[in-house]
Amino acid sequence: MALFMAILGVLVLLLCLCSALLKWNEVRFRRKGLPPGAMGWPVFGETTEFLKQGPNFMKNKRARYGSFFKSHILGCPTIVSMDPELNRFILMNEAKGLVPGYPQSMLDILGTRNIAAVHGSTHKYMRGALLSIISPTLIRDQLLPKIDEFMRTHLMDWDNKVINIQEKTKEMAFLSSLKQIAGMESSSIAQPFMTEFFKLVLGTLSLPINLPRTNYRGGLQARKSIISILSRLLEERKASQDVHVDMLGCLMKKDENRYKLNDEEIIDLVITIMYSGYETVSTTSMMAVKYLHDHPKVLEEIRKEHFAIRERKKPEDPIDCNDLKSMRFTRAVIFETSRLATIVNGVLRKTTHDMELNGYLIPKGWRIYVYTREINYDPFLYHDPLTFNPWRWLGNSLESQSHFLIFGGGTRQCPGKELGIAEISTFLHYFVTRYRWEEVGGDKLMKFPRVVAPNGLHIRVSSFSN
């Protein structure tokens, strides 16, 4: 009996302590003028609930506090914004103190000179360097031919096989990007680079705890290995004096390039290019295959578009820019896939000083999470939003609307948007004109915090001509 009473006393004490901690944390952040919301536990905040409940966490918060509220997620005090017009203001006003606020693990692993980490004049310079190697002219003359050649080869031997389309699109996104960056030399560095790159990606999505066997430690080590691979490639190119028609060759042209980067900046920019395109291109391609399988009328329409292109060409003729421009329905499929699957959940900003926003005080150093998932499913913005309907993007000017944040927004809109669309469009062109496919079944999809098939997404592929 005495033991029972002692245990009961300890439990009551713990309950009181927990209640006091929660109350103290709320009082600590109850400054005059802050948006409504709750801060959860000290240190951990509401991160556990956010990751566990996912979209339901945000829905419940929105129902209780509205479209602009405070929380404590991802390791720091955070304001969550789901208001389309306010989101546009936040993303358009970096100069007013709303700078990128990405997690520390991402900044550490992608490098101090990566385009997501810098702002002001440095960001303008690095973005200019990036845009100079993915301009419409270079996409037309150099990058698209490489993409076409790669996709033809990558999709060559899928007939009569059961494949994991998740793994195939991951390989596709990585290897296609590497070919554009390093040209002919990409084949010699692909395998060691890819092994380390996948570790790097995991590290950016982890807590910044630098202990053995953590994803964060693995990401930091992977970064060192990738720097070694790229540094060796840069030195070999400097020694050879050969002309290389690829992204790396453009970046290394000191005399002809107005954006003169040192080796460290070039390496960080290459890692940024690889990282930025990898997740969006691979996951959008996988989910497009999934949605096309589930919606036969959409598949019929996209096949009609691509067979019309093939009828104008000889079998060996590559895709060119005029073909890309004619892929209006394919572009709509890509946008609708990105919207419905919500490949990117939101964008993070950080305040550089105390400021007023939407009538509330936002303290210096707080994160602002422009949460786009709920906007993608807003029935006032998208009719019947949970239905996969690419036709909604044809002739409705949705791409020019302020709530269109699938590729980011404001001064940080994804500079590689058109290049990514070109890669996915070319992949879909050869996939739907060469093959039929059916799902093997039993594979599950998770859509939060990332879109992923934990056990893969397996499909049985056969030749379309059969």
From Swiss-Prot:
<keyword id="KW-0408">Iron</keyword>
<dbReference type="GO" id="GO:0004497">
    <property type="term" value="F:monooxygenase activity"/>
</dbReference>
<dbReference type="Pfam" id="PF00067">
    <property type="entry name" value="p450"/>
</dbReference>
<keyword id="KW-0560">Oxidoreductase</keyword>
<keyword id="KW-1133">Transmembrane helix</keyword>
<dbReference type="GO" id="GO:0016705">
    <property type="term" value="F:oxidoreductase activity, acting on paired donors, with incorporation or reduction of molecular oxygen"/>
</dbReference>
<dbReference type="GO" id="GO:0020037">
    <property type="term" value="F:heme binding"/>
</dbReference>
<feature type="binding site" description="axial binding residue">
    <location>
        <position position="414"/>
    </location>
    <ligand>
        <name>heme</name>
    </ligand>
</feature>
<keyword id="KW-0812">Transmembrane</keyword>
<comment type="function">
    <text>Catalyzes the C6-oxidation step in brassinosteroids biosynthesis.</text>
</comment>
<dbReference type="GO" id="GO:0010268">
    <property type="term" value="P:brassinosteroid homeostasis"/>
</dbReference>
<dbReference type="InterPro" id="IPR017972">
    <property type="entry name" value="Cyt_P450_CS"/>
</dbReference>
<dbReference type="InterPro" id="IPR036396">
    <property type="entry name" value="Cyt_P450_sf"/>
</dbReference>
<comment type="similarity">
    <text>Belongs to the cytochrome P450 family.</text>
</comment>
<keyword id="KW-0472">Membrane</keyword>
<dbReference type="GO" id="GO:0016020">
    <property type="term" value="C:membrane"/>
</dbReference>
<dbReference type="InterPro" id="IPR002401">
    <property type="entry name" value="Cyt_P450_E_grp-I"/>
</dbReference>
<protein>
    <recommendedName>
        <fullName>Cytochrome P450 85A</fullName>
        <ecNumber>1.14.14.-</ecNumber>
    </recommendedName>
</protein>
<dbReference type="GO" id="GO:0016125">
    <property type="term" value="P:sterol metabolic process"/>
</dbReference>
<keyword id="KW-0479">Metal-binding</keyword>
<keyword id="KW-0349">Heme</keyword>
<dbReference type="GO" id="GO:0016132">
    <property type="term" value="P:brassinosteroid biosynthetic process"/>
</dbReference>
<dbReference type="InterPro" id="IPR001128">
    <property type="entry name" value="Cyt_P450"/>
</dbReference>
<feature type="transmembrane region" description="Helical">
    <location>
        <begin position="2"/>
        <end position="22"/>
    </location>
</feature>
<keyword id="KW-0503">Monooxygenase</keyword>
<dbReference type="GO" id="GO:0005506">
    <property type="term" value="F:iron ion binding"/>
</dbReference>
